[in-house]
Structures are given as structure tokens and as C-alpha cells.
Amino acid sequence: MFSSLYPLARASLFKMDAEDAHHLTLRMLGAAGRTGLARALSSRVPDAPRTVMGLTFRNPVGLAAGLDKDGAAIDGFAALGFGFIEVGTVTPRAQPGNPRPRMFRLPEAGAIINRMGFNNSGVDQFVKNVQAARYRGVLGLNIGKNADTPIERAADDYLYCLERVYPFASYVTINISSPNTKNLRQLQGAGELDALLAALKNKQQRLADLHGKLVPLALKIAPDLDDEQVKDIAATLLRHNIEGVIATNTTLSRDAVKGLPHADEAGGLSGRPVFDASNAVIRKLHAELGDAVPIIGVGGIFSGDDARAKLAAGASLVQLYTGFIYRGPALVAECVKAIARGQTR
């Protein structure tokens, strides 16, 4: 039902400031999840289970991190048919993020530019929100570092967040690829990444012993990587037995949107313009990783065919963000059905 209403809702939402519309949508979905209204409005999405990272996903189409940074609307999003949900990015302490305005639509390109800067209520409130949710499907919890934490101490923030979210996560995503936290992408460098993943794997094993379960780790990377960087990252993932990789985050490139309103705004560009770059990284990763480390593909999915293209490039699962904002819940079912059709041919 909500899928059929979304085009009307979008017309009103797109007249608003992009971030105000985002917050209004989150409040509505959060309220719907708490009251049970979400179930009445739920989208009919067929089950298409698959097992990845040792987890069974209801279907291969998930919600990407960033839409629900505080995990405040998990039940509302769950009713829309996603096969898994990822929330965050969360940091140890609450922080406001970058000054507004910091989110801009580029409808001519099917794109969004954001420079949010990991605005969130902190990991303690995040955990409370996650615990309050009734959703029992696969839930990814995405962690990052505070803006005022020196990059040399970044591991401290990731380790702290990992310990706090571990008992409540199906998997944990290590976000080192946002362009909106100063120097964060330095952690994708070979030496920095090796040290960070070594520390996180050590912590993961100790937490697994403590809680009696191994929660997989996934690394989220940028599309703005050359071939050698992708190879180095793949080798580091294999060396540390990281369970998954998410490709990709937003891009700093503006080649596809030159001349459009807001194109020169600072921040990460998402949506259709990142589709090809994301797929290229997925193909390169898959060539290096094979089936040893599953890939979650995200970036520019606006149709079922787009989702299938991500899988054809080497992804095992996909996530939606900007396409979901433009297309609404109907995109979830379209992607699930298109992937299922491709598997039966």
C-alpha cells in the first residue's frame, strides 16, 4: 500500500529542504513502526532467501546505512520488504555533524550530494534504539569514528563501538570511506588498514568468546580507488579473514554532474552517477577475492536490472539508498523479483 502512495508523498517531500524531508520521513516511519501501522502499510515482497557471511537473508536487497543513522526507524523500514537492514554510521559520542545545509538533490542526474559528517546521537542511544526494535531479521550496525578523534587514534573509536554494538548486530560494518570526516579515507591505505583490521579481528574473537557467537565484520570502501588500491584492500581482507566487503560509498567525482545545480557542493555524490564506478570496483574486488569474501553491492541502483548488474559484477547482495529516495518502496520488490527471474533463467 505504501508503495502506491509514495509518488504522491515524494512530490510533497521534494518541495522541502532535502534534510528536512529526510527527518520527516524518518519520524513517520519510526512512528509507524512503533504503533504497528507499518504492518498495515507493508509492502508485499516475495521471499528469496540466500545465505551470505553465514547469515540467512530473507531476500538479497537491503537498506544501506545512512538513511537511519540512529536506528530510530528499524521497524518502519522492515515493513517495506527489505531483506536486511543496515543502520548507522554511529560514533562513540554524539556529534552534530557538519553545518547545514549539507544535503542536496540533483534530480536531473538521479543523485544526491551530502556532507552530513556522521551526525548521530552516539552509540549508547543507538544501542537503546536497536534494542527497542521488534525486527528480528538480519541487522547490520555501521560504526565510525568521531570527527575530533585524531586519525592516529581512530582504532580506539572503532574498537569501542564494536564492543558496544556487538551483542545486538547480525554483522558490523567498518566505515572507513565517508568523504565527510577529515582524513577518514586515509584508513584505506595498506598500512593503516592492516593495523585497523588486525585490531578489530582480535577484538571480534574476544567478543565471540564472551558472547558465544561470531558476528561477521564487513568493510565499507570508496569508489574512488585505483586498481592497486583495490588489490591492496582485497589482500588485506583475505589476510585478516574479514567476512564481507561493501562496495561502494559515495564518490568525490563530479564528472557526471558538471553544470547541474548544486554540482559544486562539497561532499559525497550518490545515485546514478556512481553506478558504473561502483560496479567497476565490485568487478575488481571479485577478481581478487573470488568467493572467499562476499561483496555487498551499493551505488546507483534505480531498477531491477541495475540490481542484477551488481550481482553480475560479483556482488552477493545489494543495498539501496538514493534510488530508494527517488523511487520509494516499489524499488525493493522490483529488485527482488528481477534477481529471482535472473536466477531461474
Swiss-Prot record:
Substrate binds at residues 69, 114-118, 175, 180, 249-250. The lineage of its organism: Bacteria, Pseudomonadati, Pseudomonadota, Betaproteobacteria, Burkholderiales. Keywords: Cell membrane, Flavoprotein, FMN, Membrane, Oxidoreductase, Pyrimidine biosynthesis. The gene is pyrD. Its main location: membrane. Belongs to the dihydroorotate dehydrogenase family. Type 2 subfamily. Its EC number is 1.3.5.2. One of its GO terms (biological process) is 'de novo' pyrimidine nucleobase biosynthetic process. Monomer. InterPro entries: Aldolase_TIM (IPR013785), DHO_dehydrogenase (IPR050074), Dihydroorotate_DH_1_2 (IPR012135), Dihydroorotate_DH_2 (IPR005719), Dihydroorotate_DH_cat (IPR005720), Dihydroorotate_DH_CS (IPR001295). It comes from Burkholderia thailandensis (strain ATCC 700388 / DSM 13276 / CCUG 48851 / CIP 106301 / E264). It is a peripheral membrane protein. Pfam families: DHO_dh. FMN binds at residues 65-69, 89, 142, 175, 220, 248, 271, 300, 321-322. The active site is at residue 178. This is Dihydroorotate dehydrogenase (quinone). One of its GO terms (molecular function) is dihydroorotate dehydrogenase (quinone) activity. Catalyzes the conversion of dihydroorotate to orotate with quinone as electron acceptor. It catalyses: (S)-dihydroorotate + a quinone = orotate + a quinol. Its cofactor is FMN. GO terms for cellular component: cytoplasm; plasma membrane. HAMAP family: DHO_dh_type2. It is found in: Cell membrane. Pathway: Pyrimidine metabolism; UMP biosynthesis via de novo pathway; orotate from (S)-dihydroorotate (quinone route): step 1/1. Binds 1 FMN per subunit.
